Amino acid sequence: MYLERIDSPQDLKRLSVPELEKLAEEIREAIIEVVLGKTGGHFAPNLGTVELTLALHYVFDSPRDKIVWDVGHQAYPHKLVTGRRDRFHTIRQEGGLSGFLQREESPHDHFGAGHASTSISAALGMAVAAKLRGDRYHTIAVIGDGALTGGMAYEALNHAGALQVPLIVVLNDNEMSIAPNVGALARYLTRVRTDTRYRQAKVEIERLLRRLPQGERLVELSHRFLDGLKEVVYRTMIWEELGFTYIGPIDGHNLRELIETFQLVKTFDSPVFVHVLTVKGKGYQPAEDDPFKHHSAAVKVPGAPPTPPRYQDVFGQTLVELAAKNDRIVAITAAMPDGTGLLPFAAAYPDRFFDVGIAEQHAVTFAAGLATQGLRPVCAIYSTFLQRAYDQVIHDVCIQKLPVVFAMDRAGLVGEDGRTHHGVFDVAYLRCLPNMVLMAPKDEDELRHMLATALAYEEGPIALRYPRGSGVGVPMLGEPRVLPIGRAELLREGSDVAIVALGATVLPAERAADILAERGIRATVINARFVKPLDRSLILDAARECGCLVTVEEAQLAGGFGSAVLETLADAGLLIPVLRLGLADRFFDHASQASLRRQAGIDAESIASRTLAFLATHGRIETGAISDR
């Protein structure tokens, strides 16, 4: 066993290439065992980067040399050889290793990651810092072909080419996303080859060659030479024009070739681009056969009861149904057709479906352009990724009052993916925008109605936020109906306290009301439905009736839903005790969604206990009523 002897990258340097190859096999076995059998997580990407990881750590000297991994989907082998082998079984578990890169987790994690296309910018900053401070170390950015579709990556490449500082960019090309880019270059070169002047020159050269002895043979050789040259040009021209020396393509599973290549590029004093070809899912045949399906893996519990449909699937199916009745509906996603539930829509309406790649800024403005021409674009993007297009939401959509629908999946606490993926800021960053309508469903059935509402709303942009995972199991009967804009839902009436809950916290709020009822406390419960516009009338009536109020949200408290309710009360001159429950001013790490909600104090038991303490503090109940909680 070689893996058990690797406590740091320095240990790799004592191994021969054949021993490194055996180590690669052991690393794959460890990833398969842990990810498939224990923790879940990103699977196929990590299997594809084992040899690349070993070669980088064999040639370079981390942590002195800076290896910056993009996104982090491919960082498990890196974690295994940088002193975290003994904790690898805790990956993505509460209190365990992160599934992504975190600077505080290891000195070998030089830059935190979770979102795509950031590695080259960060690595370039480190390379420039070395030059300014007179330090001597190598800087390497490792980026996948999927992340390379992000515009930020090209901004960084352009800047690096201009600065001409030593920087190594490694493209991990598993052919999952780069084909459209290559196709665009191919189309450009095709236009050159079909230009009249080019074709005339080609005919004249061939005519002259045929006059020579062995002329036909020379013509054949010229064609073969041009074909080879064309292939080289396709691969190298863009990187050379950006100011990089291009090397590749390299077999990403040939350790000897990788090591020799990296030893060579260590000597460069200007930007170099190393093109590495890998197989996503390498070493696990089902993942090699279907890397898309095996991009990430979830642990399956034998005998587990069936779960309700996932929010993303309810969204996707409802959109298909609505699109059948309205040919103006189009769907847009940024490289997440499966995660957003849009694969059925893509299959049913391929001409009305657009996957723009990792390009959220473009996705939003593209949707705005579609909306100017009378179409009804639905832009389905994870809440955390919509942050990347905030200026476009303001400048290109809200200012122009364009009817774009923003379907924000993974809103709230997402679980094991952790701090980079929680969608907890959207309420604050969207409710402040003029012309924006913002709503959140309490369950999967209400999601159907809110999607219908959004598509019926033509007066400007409208956003709906909904959580990751399965719904709550309510029946979904009848056609989706249009809800009144800005109208909340009164779920139960009481006179002791009013609980106003948003989205996924409505059901826990109802359960908390049941707990309070056991203590003789009668609570009004309101499903807010809308953050903007708020149902001012219902909220103010409940506040006056009860004399105190609790808000609950699975979002950041600062600037959030509770703040909107406080503003409404203040504007009405209604000064009553208010308790805001939501996410405190910190980043939440990875854990199960249930655990994270307990940490945040927004599960049913926490809502009830905190409400009891709140009522006692303000003299609404006797302190003894909460003594046993």
From Swiss-Prot:
One of its GO terms (molecular function) is 1-deoxy-D-xylulose-5-phosphate synthase activity. SUPFAM superfamilies: Thiamin diphosphate-binding fold (THDP-binding) (SSF52518), TK C-terminal domain-like (SSF52922). Its cofactor is Mg(2+); thiamine diphosphate. Thiamine diphosphate binds at residues 73, 114-116, 146-147, 174, 284, 360. Binds 1 Mg(2+) ion per subunit. Its EC number is 2.2.1.7. The keyword Metal-binding applies. Mg(2+) binds at residues 145, 174. It comes from the Bacteria. Pfam families: DXP_synthase_N (PF13292), Transket_pyr (PF02779), Transketolase_C (PF02780). It is an enzyme of class 2 (transferase). PROSITE patterns: TRANSKETOLASE_1. Pathway: Metabolic intermediate biosynthesis; 1-deoxy-D-xylulose 5-phosphate biosynthesis; 1-deoxy-D-xylulose 5-phosphate from D-glyceraldehyde 3-phosphate and pyruvate: step 1/1. One of its GO terms (cellular component) is cytosol. Signal peptide: none annotated. GO terms for biological process: 1-deoxy-D-xylulose 5-phosphate biosynthetic process; isopentenyl diphosphate biosynthetic process, methylerythritol 4-phosphate pathway; terpenoid biosynthetic process; thiamine biosynthetic process. Keywords: Isoprene biosynthesis, Magnesium, Metal-binding, Thiamine biosynthesis, Thiamine pyrophosphate, Transferase. It catalyses: D-glyceraldehyde 3-phosphate + pyruvate + H(+) = 1-deoxy-D-xylulose 5-phosphate + CO2. Catalyzes the acyloin condensation reaction between C atoms 2 and 3 of pyruvate and glyceraldehyde 3-phosphate to yield 1-deoxy-D-xylulose-5-phosphate (DXP). Belongs to the transketolase family. DXPS subfamily. NCBIfam families: dxs (TIGR00204), PRK05444.2-2 (NF003933). Homodimer. This is 1-deoxy-D-xylulose-5-phosphate synthase.
